[in-house]
Amino acid sequence: MAIKDLFNNFFLMDDEEEVESPEERQRRVVQNEENETNNVQQNQPQQSERSYSNQSKLKTVPQKKTTRNYNSEERNVRMNQPPSKSNGKNVVTMNQTSQSYSGYESSKMCLFEPRVFSDTQDIADELKNRRATLVNLQRIDKISAKRIIDFLSGTVYAIGGDIQRVGTDIFLCTPDNVEVAGSITDHIEQMESQHYE
C-alpha cells in the first residue's frame, strides 16, 4: 500500500501551495539569469585552465592506427575482382593427366630383382610414377614370388595398367600410359618345356 500512496501523492497538489503571480515569476527568472551570468564569468578562468590541462593530456595519448578501414577496402577490392583462371580449376581428371605425361615418361623402364617381399613397395612406387617395370623373380622362393605377383597385380589393376609374363619368372608391369604390342606366349611355352626336361 505504501507504494500506491506514494504514487497517488506524487501527482496531487496540496491546497496550501501558493500560486505564483506572473510578476513574481518574472522576477525569479531574471534573478536566475543574473546568477548564471555571474557564475559563468567567475568560472571562465577555471574552465580555461581545465581545458588547457585536458589538451595537454590529449597530446600525450598515442593515436590509434586505423588498420580496419584498410583491411575492409582491400577485402572489397578482392571481392570485386573476377576470379583468376589458375584458381578456378583445381581438379584434374586422370585422362587429361595421362595425355600430358604420355610424351616423355613412357620412355623410361625400371628393372627389378627383388630378394624379399618388402622390395615390392619400390616396384609399386615406380608404377605409380607411370614408369614401366620389368621384374625378375628367378632368385626368390616360389611362395614369396607368388605374393609379389599378387601384390603387383593389385597395384597394376588400381592404376589401370597391365601385367604380362615375358619369361620364366619374369614379368612386365606397365601403367596405363604404356602399350605393349605383340605376344611371346609361344616362346614362353617352349622355354618352360625345355626348363623342365
UniProtKB/Swiss-Prot annotation:
Bias type Low complexity, positions: 37-47
Outline the segment boundaries, as ranges, of region: Disordered.
15-91
Residue runs in coiled coils = none
Q: Does the keyword Cytoplasm apply?
A: yes
Q: Where is the composition biased (Basic and acidic residues)?
A: 22-31
The keyword tRNA-binding appears for this protein? no
Compartment list:
Cytoplasm
BP terms from Gene Ontology? division septum assembly; FtsZ-dependent cytokinesis
Per the record, its GO cellular-component terms are: cytoplasm
Its main subcellular localisation, reduced to a broad class, is cytoplasm
What's this protein's family per the entry? Belongs to the SepF family.
Q: Its function?
A: Cell division protein that is part of the divisome complex and is recruited early to the Z-ring. Probably stimulates Z-ring formation, perhaps through the cross-linking of FtsZ protofilaments. Its function overlaps with FtsA.
Q: What is this protein called?
A: Cell division protein SepF
